[in-house]
Amino acid sequence: MAKAKKVGARRKASGAPAGARGGPAKANSNPFEVKVNRQKFQILGRKTRHDVGLPGVSRARALRKRTQTLLKEYKERDKSNVFRDKRFGEYNSNMSPEEKMMKRFALEQQRHHEKKSIYNLNEDEELTHYGQSLADIEKHNDIVDSDSDAEDRGTLSAELTAAHFGGGGGLLHKKTQQEGEEREKPKSRKELIEELIAKSKQEKRERQAQREDALELTEKLDQDWKEIQTLLSHKTPKSENRDKKEKPKPDAYDMMVRELGFEMKAQPSNRMKTEAELAKEEQEHLRKLEAERLRRMLGKDEDENVKKPKHMSADDLNDGFVLDKDDRRLLSYKDGKMNVEEDVQEEQSKEASDPESNEEEGDSSGGEDTEESDSPDSHLDLESNVESEEENEKPAKEQRQTPGKGLISGKERAGKATRDELPYTFAAPESYEELRSLLLGRSMEEQLLVVERIQKCNHPSLAEGNKAKLEKLFGFLLEYVGDLATDDPPDLTVIDKLVVHLYHLCQMFPESASDAIKFVLRDAMHEMEEMIETKGRAALPGLDVLIYLKITGLLFPTSDFWHPVVTPALVCLSQLLTKCPILSLQDVVKGLFVCCLFLEYVALSQRFIPELINFLLGILYIATPNKASQGSTLVHPFRALGKNSELLVVSAREDVATWQQSSLSLRWASRLRAPTSTEANHIRLSCLAVGLALLKRCVLMYGSLPSFHAIMGPLQALLTDHLADCSHPQELQELCQSTLTEMESQKQLCRPLTCEKSKPVPLKLFTPRLVKVLEFGRKQGSSKEEQERKRLIHKHKREFKGAVREIRKDNQFLARMQLSEIMERDAERKRKVKQLFNSLATQEGEWKALKRKKFKK
């Protein structure tokens, strides 16, 4: 048996784990949980790590770690209070528990002593008397020792002392007081009322006496004051008092309050009338004026429309009949003579002044209907009134001699004046001939008045077809302006005034106005193109087309990048400066006018116009002799040599001396007769002055361009070499010098490209360095810093990916925890609901069973 036991023991020893024999116990891993990272190539000498992994073990370890940290934070996310153990030495592992307790006790005693015993003076030492504490003796202060005899007197009462040592006087006094109290009996109600009445009467008498004393004192004071006032009758003047006592100045707040208090309140005004209402009122006003004019033209008087009084009957007391005045005069004397003649003269002067006052009253009464302060027809009415007054200022004798003749001639003259007067209402013209017939033969003011009244009588808000009528009127006015421009001499003042009406119509109907302008410009350009195709060249258009281009710049905005009217007008201007040759002085004047229009168009946008610079260069070229200006390059429409290459050269010294600088009139552009030689020379000098002024404006406008000096180079050469001499007038020389200074003052923003004078000598170089081409995908040799940098970048990238992976796993863990909480809550709720239904079912069953028992009974 013993042998068998020994064999079993040996077997157990051999089968025991390695840890029992001193070695560490190694857990047998599940082969299904082992993940082997297979390598594609076996490399000798390489130490492989992580070739075998245990994902289950690492996952369990990570789950346990998250449960201890992340889950704890998640559960305590809504808690704001935390228990902190601040006991001394709690987290110090070097101290033993006994040392911690001793140190804590010492700190507690020290804290207690610092707080409560800081102001006590030796209170820890208890004072004793015969072995007994003094505090206990103070508590038992009623105990009296036999030795303390001095305090016995203080314990006797006053009554006892008076009874024993006062000879009995105290007892007698006490007895007399008792007898006096017995004698005082309570009063009855009647006695109390009488006593109250007596007291009230006594108080009333006292108040009356006080009032009388006060009155006596006030009377006495008044008398004394009157006596003193007589002595103080002499007063100081007010000016001295003002000097002595200055009045305080009112504050800004007081002034503001007074201003607001005394400020006039706003009165309600009439509402603002609409444009349609204003147009209707204007039309009615013009109709009334036209009716008055027709009535005056026919010779009808206002008195004819007034009803005349009928025959007066005997019983008619108020039928328009006025009794005759009593012409008898009172007899009066002055210095002993009668005042008959003076009275007669005064009455005659009054009678002479009465008609004038009546006329003034009539004019003022009718002035409300005929008042037009801003329109020119008011001046015409004043002229007619002046004429009628002059006619009425004839001798009174002639009127007395032939009253019938004077009346007839006055009516005829009034009718003639009204016939010459303009009508107040006009129908819109249906054709250009109608408008021309209305305007021809009239002065400038009358023409403007006719156009204004046509617009007012045919306002679009008055009738349905008035819009189309006014749109036609714009085209008719354009055609009329062209006719005025083609006259010799052109009526430029009327054109200038008509532009205002064209502008108003353009603002009302912009589409029709733009169509009309484009039609006129298109017609002029087609005509010029046809002439170029047939004859090979085309002259500059007439003054009407130039004025149309001028009106275009006034009616429409010229600074837009693209405009349906202004852009074609700019193209038209550029074609005029490039395709029309300069053959005469009229062409020069027209070309300079086109240049002025160009500058007006681009004044705001500051666009560069090469045609403008080329034309000004040609003007300066034809103002210099051919020999002097050789070498300059010109383009069409100018020629370097030819008949008109010296068109603006002035050789007559007398004409140069008599020339005066002035503005160049447009009348020279449409003049049919040829000017004299002196006039022609003056025109040449004026054209040169205008060209220099335009060039100066171009210099100021284009000074900021990078290519400014390249553009102005030929012009500057002509000015410096040929035009700045003494052969021209002083004004032209000053203008030329100012233009040159402006050119030179502009900064050169860029340097032009130039060819190198000689080929540059190359520098001596060393042997070139050969660099091996690096193969992509391999780590090439580099410095230690570069290797360290790459290593850190690789490590940062790896750590970043690992952090993102861990954050993703944390989110998944929290999502699982939240889902488990939700499922637990749902299961708990389901369990409670099920329990509730079970209890209700049990209760229902018991109630039904009880009901069945009752039914059986």
Swiss-Prot record:
A Pfam family: Nop14
Locations listed in the record: Nucleus, Nucleolus
GO annotation, cellular component aspect: 90S preribosome; membrane; Noc4p-Nop14p complex; nucleolus; nucleoplasm; small-subunit processome
List of residues that carry Phosphoserine: 96, 146, 148, 349
Amino acid composition bias (Basic and acidic residues), ranges on this chain: 176-227, 237-252, 272-300, 322-340, 410-422
GO MF annotations, alphabetized: enzyme binding; RNA binding; snoRNA binding
Biased composition (Acidic residues): 354-375
Main location as per UniProt: nucleus
Region (Disordered): 1-34, 162-252, 264-422
InterPro entries: Nop14 (IPR007276)
Biased composition (Low complexity): 14-27
Compositional bias (Basic residues): 1-13
GO BP annotations, alphabetical order: endonucleolytic cleavage in 5'-ETS of tricistronic rRNA transcript (SSU-rRNA, 5.8S rRNA, LSU-rRNA); endonucleolytic cleavage in ITS1 to separate SSU-rRNA from 5.8S rRNA and LSU-rRNA from tricistronic rRNA transcript (SSU-rRNA, 5.8S rRNA, LSU-rRNA); endonucleolytic cleavage to generate mature 5'-end of SSU-rRNA from (SSU-rRNA, 5.8S rRNA, LSU-rRNA); maturation of SSU-rRNA; maturation of SSU-rRNA from tricistronic rRNA transcript (SSU-rRNA, 5.8S rRNA, LSU-rRNA); ribosomal small subunit biogenesis; rRNA processing
Key words, A-Z: Nucleus, Phosphoprotein, Ribosome biogenesis, rRNA processing
Subunit relationships: Component of the ribosomal small subunit (SSU) processome.
UniProt record similarity statement: Belongs to the NOP14 family.
Protein function: Involved in nucleolar processing of pre-18S ribosomal RNA. Has a role in the nuclear export of 40S pre-ribosomal subunit to the cytoplasm.
Protein name: Nucleolar protein 14
Gene source species: Homo sapiens
